[in-house]
């Protein structure tokens, strides 16, 4: 029998504010622990410099309007300009995919410089295939800092019931073939691939005008504007792009609280080994029980381990604009006070005043489409489908988004190159974004739903599985295999074909 307990790692939107400096990187790269609660960053590739217009004119600047009839045949031979809102991991990976294909892109990041957390996360072999499709440089960046699980199995343990000491389920680690690393290390590695000038920092999106002229006018908090042909919102779980696209009152404009919180830390490996024992401490293990569960695993080739405690916290979250708060370690210890001694020892390793993250997602109110009515604005990653971390696939879904977006935009622009008019350019962008949304909606939204279910199963909250090990295994196995066995290349090819069909 196999286990499917993979390595739930928090999404970008749920990361902490612990950061590591990237002192050897160019200019603005550094850390700012006050700015990265819901947005992570990383960026670099070497083929194009952005020419996107970014002016410091005020919001009353006159943009001469052109009648629809005069636009129909108007020549538009200039390079297409794509804006990505959000310089997180998915925003940067998407940018690298466009740069790799020679597409003009500028990333607008709200933070004043690159920052990232010191937490760990992992990518399956399917996610790595998607990275390779985006750009070989993305995969190279990961492999520079990541390492596979050294233990031959990923194992599930009952962390609560006395006497239940053996792993109840396990699977060969080669099945998902996770490669784990520190988020900060991956950012640093990606940063080595981004051309200078691609990312504009300190750009907080206030609004955009998606007008009939075929351009999108972005307005930023600092009073500057930028006019582009298309926008990709990769601005995280609290996406401003999504809110503008849907409207403030739309049910899907904001994410919802899942009544689960997480305590996470990167710990000395020797401490984890002392708590769990030599075998478990050096491997990828999950311990589940009532209203909580833990995940622990070594990080890459470092003497460190990633540890997360998830627990139920029912009711509402007081401030949905702030997804983390500092608490006392005792609040985490209370969640496992009746658990086995080794799990209590593991949780005791948390710092005295750890951060507690409220886990939000978009499961209750999914967006109706990933593309705006005009077809020139779309959303990706957490902005489109913010997930809980229980399927360990939230970041992977964003990478798949990037693979599809890079492919369909490249396809559409090749089709458009034979007729460079404003209308044809608009049609090309719309075809690309609609193909992306149509291909990605079902899979990514299913992951959001399934991840929520896996969390309930792990915390013995699911009515159908309760504490029955076999039922828990079957419920989770089904959902994990749909992630692991997915054909990313076939999906990308379907998206390419759909884009051509929509453009023709």
UniProtKB/Swiss-Prot annotation:
SUPFAM superfamilies: FAD/NAD(P)-binding domain. Residues 1-76 are annotated as: Disordered. Residues 25-39 have a biased composition (Basic and acidic residues). Pathway: Secondary metabolite biosynthesis. FAD binds at residues 109, 183, 382, 395. Disruption phenotype: Abolishes the production of Aspernidine A. Disulfide bonds: none annotated. Its EC number is 1.-.-.-. The keyword Oxidoreductase applies. GO terms for molecular function: FAD binding; monooxygenase activity. InterPro entries: FAD-bd (IPR002938), FAD/NAD-bd_sf (IPR036188), FAD_monoxygenase (IPR051104). The keyword Zinc-finger does not apply. Keywords: FAD, Flavoprotein, Monooxygenase, Oxidoreductase. The active site is at 264, 297. Residues 1-13, 45-62 have a biased composition (Low complexity). It comes from the Eukaryota. GO terms for biological process: secondary metabolite biosynthetic process. Belongs to the paxM FAD-dependent monooxygenase family. FAD-dependent monooxygenase; part of the gene cluster that mediates the biosynthesis of aspernidine A, a prenylated isoindolinone. The starting point of the biosynthesis of aspernidin A is the production of orsellinaldehyde by the non-reducing polyketide synthase pkfA. Hydroxylation, methylation of one of the phenol groups, and prenylation, presumably catalyzed by the prenyltransferase pkfE, would be needed to yield aspernidine D. Subsequently, the cytochrome P450 monooxygenase pkfB is responsible for hydroxylation of aspernidine D to yield aspernidine E. This is FAD-dependent monooxygenase pkfD.
């Amino acid at each position: 029998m196999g286990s499917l307990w993979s390595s739930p790692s928090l999404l970008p939107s749920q990361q902490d504010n612990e950061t590591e400096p990237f002192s050897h990187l160019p200019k603005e790269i550094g850390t700012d622990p006050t700015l990265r609660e819901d947005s992570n960053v990383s960026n670099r590739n070497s083929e194009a410099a952005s020419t996107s217009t970014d002016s410091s004119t005020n919001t009353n600047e006159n943009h001469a309007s052109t009648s629809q009839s005069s636009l129909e045949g108007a020549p538009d031979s200039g390079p297409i300009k794509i804006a990505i809102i959000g310089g997180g991991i998915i925003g940067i990976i998407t940018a690298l995919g466009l740069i790799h294909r020679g597409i003009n892109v500028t990333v607008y990041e709200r933070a004043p410089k690159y920052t990232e957390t010191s937490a760990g996360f992992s990518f399956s072999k399917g996610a790595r295939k998607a990275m390779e499709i985006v750009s070989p440089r993305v995969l190279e960046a990961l492999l520079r800092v990541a390492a596979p699980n050294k233990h031959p199995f990923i194992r599930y343990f009952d962390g609560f019931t006395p006497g239940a000491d053996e792993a109840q389920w396990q699977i060969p680690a080669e099945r998902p073939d996770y490669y784990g690393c520190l988020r900060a290390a991956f950012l640093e590695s990606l940063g080595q691939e981004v051309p200078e000038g691609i990312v504009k920092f300190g750009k907080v999106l206030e609004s955009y005008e998606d007008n009939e002229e075929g351009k999108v006018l972005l307005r930023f908090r600092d009073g500057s504007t930028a006019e582009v042909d298309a926008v990709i919102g990769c601005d995280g779980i609290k996406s401003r792009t999504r809110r503008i696209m849907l409207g403030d009152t739309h049910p899907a404009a904001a994410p919802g609280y899942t009544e689960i919180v997480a305590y996470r830390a990167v710990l000395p490996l020797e401490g984890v080994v002392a708590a769990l024992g030599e075998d478990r401490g050096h491997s990828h293990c999950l311990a589940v029980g009532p209203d909580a569960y833990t995940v622990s695993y070594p990080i890459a080739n470092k003497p460190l381990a990633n540890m997360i405690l998830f627990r139920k916290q029912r009711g509402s979250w007081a401030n949905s604009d702030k997804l983390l708060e500092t608490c006392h370690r005792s609040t985490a210890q209370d969640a496992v006070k009746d658990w086995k001694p080794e799990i209590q020892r593991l949780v005791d390793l948390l710092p005295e005043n750890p951060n507690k993250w409220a886990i939000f997602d978009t499961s209750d109110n999914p967006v109706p489409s990933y593309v705006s009515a005009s077809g020139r604005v779309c959303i990706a990653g957490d902005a489109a489908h913010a997930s809980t971390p229980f399927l360990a696939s939230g970041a992977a879904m964003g990478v798949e988004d990037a693979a599809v977006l890079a492919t369909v935009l490249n396809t559409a622009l090749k089709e458009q190159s034979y007729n460079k008019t404003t209308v044809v350019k608009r049609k090309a962008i719309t075809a690309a974004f609609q193909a992306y949304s149509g291909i990605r909606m079902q899979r990514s939204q299913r992951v959001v739903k399934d991840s929520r279910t896996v969390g309930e199963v792990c915390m013995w909250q699911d009515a159908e599985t309760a504490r029955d090990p076999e039922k828990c295994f079957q419920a989770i196995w089904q959902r994990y295999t749909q992630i692991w066995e997915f054909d990313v290349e076939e999906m990308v090819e379907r998206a390419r074909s759909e884009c051509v069909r929509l453009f023709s």
